[in-house]
Amino acid sequence: MTKETIKLFSEMHAEPSWLSDLRQKAFDKIESLELPVIERVKFHRWNLGDGTITESEPSANVPDFTALDNHLKLVQVGTQTVFEQTPVELAEQGVVFTDFHSALEEIPELIEEFFMSSVKYDDDKLAAYHTAYFNSGAVLYIPDNVEIKKPIEGIFYQDSDSGVPFNKHILIIAGKNSKISYLERLESRGEGSAKATANITVEVIARSGAQVKFAAIDRLGENVTAYISRRGKLGNDASIDWAIGVMNEGNVVADFDSDLIGNGSHADLKVVALSSGRQVQGIDTRVTNYGCNSIGNILQHGVILEKATLTFNGIGHIIKGAKGADAQQESRVLMLSDQARSDANPILLIDENDVTAGHAASIGQVDPEDMYYLMSRGLDKATAERLVVRGFLGSVIVEIPVKEVRDEMIATIEEKLSKR
């Protein structure tokens, strides 16, 4: 793939010169940059991009929308937007939720200001690749002082019957003192068995006083090798409450970061992960405290089945000058097989004295006494294990503030466990 092909893609979509130029600069950097470091995860031989920038044809794998409620929603299959719904009262308040290139026409100044502002195009090889080759995406913009009570849904299907890379950029801009709940799904759809790649970046910009509840359920298929980056950038007194279910079937490296720029900003990152078969999932979860009295909490629990591998890296970094900051983390992994592999690595980097910080990490097998108790009550081994897993992950799931997300995450866990 050449720079000329990327330039032609930009021209075909009438992208502004600043974006076209950024793609070109990113392309030039790809070869010289290193892969991001995910501690104790070896993924340098994974195929995380084949250097193409193409679009999907209209797909047969389109779900039925006839029973949907009237709330803010966007659905894409591959690179195509197949459903878009914005209630009139929200449109009148200036709310925008549309595909990336349509948003470039509707709110160009905002996208130029915030696109790739929480992650830089030259941070590493995968960031540069993403900037050069992302082929679709979505933008959600909530103006200042707007509160949306119903959950907002963004559903993004990877079409397994298509060979088009799943390279998406999702940009969420929550204006000052706005308040939203957003649910995102990344899911494979179709019967195709061809190998596929995904490079997904989600940016959440929470401006001063904004309150964002962000939930995601990732269910990419076993033939998809993926890099998923979710980044939050928080202003003064802003908050992001993350709840992420990592339930993919293929190999995944993920980077979930919150930069607490503003004084009094607050981020909670709750992650539930389930690895099975022979898959490898490596997850970096990071909070960086820049602002005074900022608070960052990480709570992540994972379960490993069969011969799978799961790595949690929890990273809390308090920057010099962030007086009164607090960084806490807990990472725990439960293994249901003696052939499973796991790491849970707590990392604290503290450059300021007047702060609080703490961490906890554990890896273990199912408690035989728990299994004995459940099986003595007439449960078979598989059912008993499912109950133990639900209890182990439930301590994280119960902290998720949106009931619909809790219920869907539990159903997803049950579905994955039932495939054993």
Question: What function would you assign to each model-found segment?
Answer:
Residues M1-A128, L299, L305:
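N-terminal amphipathic, basic helical "cap/leader" segment at the start of enzyme domains
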Residues V96-L379, L393, I397-R420:
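Conserved beta-strand/loop scaffold segments within soluble protein domains that form the structured core
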Residues R390:
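Short, conserved phosphate-binding/catalytic loop or strand-edge motifs used
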